[in-house]
Amino acid sequence: MCGIVGYIGKRKAYPILIKGLKRLEYRGYDSAGVALISDNQQLNVYKTKGKVSELENFVTQKDISGTVGIAHTRWATHGEPCSVNAHPHYSSSEKLALIHNGIIENYAVLKEKLQAKGYVFKSSTDTEVLVQLIEYMKVTNRVDLLTAVQLALNEVIGAYAIAILDKEHPEEIIAARKSSPLVVGIGEDEFFLASDATPIVEYTDKVVYLEDGEIAVINRGKELKVVDLSNVEMTPEVKKVELKLGQLEKGGYPHFMLKEIFEQPDCIHDCMRGRINVEANNVVLSAVIDYKEKLLNAKRFIIVACGTSWHAGLIGKHLIESFCRIPVEVEYASEFRYRDPVIDEHDVVIAISQSGETADTLAAVELAKSRGAFIYGICNAIGSSIPRATHTGSYIHVGPEIGVASTKAFTGQVTVLTMLALTLAREKGTIDETQYLNIVRELNSIPGKMKEVLKLNDKLAELSKTFTYAHNFIYLGRGYSYPVALEGALKLKEISYIHAEGYPAAEMKHGPIALIDAEMPVVVIATQNGLYEKVLSNIQEIKARKGKVIAFVTKGDTVISKIADCSIELPETIECLDPLITTVPLQLLAYHIAVCKGMDVDQPRNLAKSVTVE
């Protein structure tokens, strides 16, 4: 959600800040703004509703001088999207300017107290309350900005990542975090600040990830200072970012989403590199081997995740239960954290998150840890909060995912879950050796089969034109394909704004069949694995009610192709690996329908890439 960028050094701040905001556009936003300490020591704030490009147009005739500044993209939580509610926010004296990502839960109480003391508010945001509170602490207690920030944050309930400028101390930025990510980049006589490393990698590969409760004091020409809310000095741990600048560009594709769909064969190969020994037909996840006893002796696994990651978790449940014979529960992290779950030291919790910053998933991890559970993380963003909070885990190594609608992260998560299940099953002795070797060999062939699927791009682009009229879609699948149906429906609704729902195919008769008529497209995953004959019966039921069937079938299928309105043939694979093949054409179908409808595919309305608030 909201993006934060900051700079202090010798260069002009504004171009760095604007470029940084553009790097963070993928996080989702509805307004943008910038605050600069100008060459003549003025604190200038400029902000607008809309895209970063609109902010650029707005400041054309403004004073954008200065080598110190902060900038922000806002995703509305308190107050509608408008320039008044956009960040940065001034304090009453206009000597302080603050940007904030997160939610101040007790803002209403704090606002009433400040209003009683004569403070006037221009916006309806919780962020303006925070900057006014900091100024109140600074003036009333006659303290410096750092102390005022510490005093104010000790009164705050909620999540925050903040950066603040003080006109009276133009050589300094104060930044702090709690339950919302913040990264400090360290350059040569300059510092960078951002919500994640993407705006920083162009300038430096040395970063410090702030921990919860830490405050960074960033001064020009001085060493980075990190303290906690009690002013105890911390030792910042400098890490190297492995991110490459080229990974953040479209590379000739019209959208990041299409690029990321086409990257999947290479991404899955990278995900498996060093983990699958092709010659020995063996899968080894070091995280499993290192904690073998804990994992093998677990009484159950609990997978916590949100959105697309939750769909991957459903596939993980099927894999682990089938291969390892360990019971698995899959929970929405947002529900798990609030329902007082029964959990103890005999449980293993698998936390899945692309960004590693998903607020509900992170909170679920902390809850499970507090009750003695062993935590295994599956994330993409290296150095993010969830990997730092877990006992062990596996990165999916698919590279940065910029498109808001997840594609390669999903298949990467499924790949890691497959390798996790296979490694555990072999260690546990619950999988037949012949079956194990067949799956490992087939898993190694998946990148090549994904490339075959991508050759269907033009056919799916043409097919999509037929269905732009639709207001509703139904997606059906059985077994491993049911979570794929859910994911396909989610992709369509996210980027095309067409209402779509996924169901287990057998559940169609328990309600959804009432919706089927000549205007209802039904996507059916009907590969020749497992329950093919039953899915065939479901298709016949749909056609009997004049529904439009788009069937994804195994290459060579001659039965369903005669019944369906359209059939797309896919390479054959083993049933448990079907999701890695069948997901890709559903991503392409959703993408092309959205493009045909003229939608903003990479930044769909109301959505954020990294959901860092509840």
Swiss-Prot record:
Keyword Cytoplasm: yes
Residue stretches making up the Glutamine amidotransferase type-2 domain: 2-221
GO cellular component, one term: cytosol
A Pfam family per the record: SIS
Gene3D superfamilies linked: Glucose-6-phosphate isomerase like protein, domain 1, Glutamine Phosphoribosylpyrophosphate, subunit 1, domain 1
EC number: 2.6.1.16
Residue stretches spanning the membrane: none
Example of a GO MF term: carbohydrate derivative binding
Repeat recorded as keyword: yes
Subunit structure: Homodimer.
Name recorded for this polypeptide: Glutamine--fructose-6-phosphate aminotransferase [isomerizing]
